[in-house]
Amino acid sequence: MTLREDLTKAVEEINAYYKELEGESTRAAVILATCSLEDELAKLIRFKKFPRECNDDTWDIIAGPTAPLGSLKNRANFGFAFGLYGEKTKEIIKQIGVVRNKFAHWTNARDFHHPDVMRETEKLKNNVISSFHVGPSEPPLVIRQQFLWLVQTLEDRLERVRGHIEELDGPLTPLP
């Protein structure tokens, strides 16, 4: 493939992702956004902590679905342990995973007003990345938008950490 074809494909994939994210149910949107965050976290860990010689087969042994780095929680802990971000970011990532799991594994959790989803989402309201309002008086669609904004903002910040080259970019302000 040429560079133009690669870029065209990447743009098409990004557009399809956002179209799907906007048009899906709350359950699907939360799962999809969190999967994207999880993928970025895996890229960050692989790029920053594993040698270039770590091929896809080896990476699957390390980070495949049933591997030690196969879960969002384990990836969050690993990234923190190796100094890719601070304790607060680790806890935010893990809590996003808890909310995602409520939607993924509970058939009656369809929006953010489900009591268990609300309780877990409230733990994110004062986070240092993108705080937001959560509560029974907030419309579920507003909570959804704020939650997705948090996930996307965190994913973008992790991507910046992954792409940062200190010799070229200078010191990086670490994630809390």
Question: Where do the language-model regions lie?
Answer:
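Amphipathic alpha-helical interface elements
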Residues: 1-176
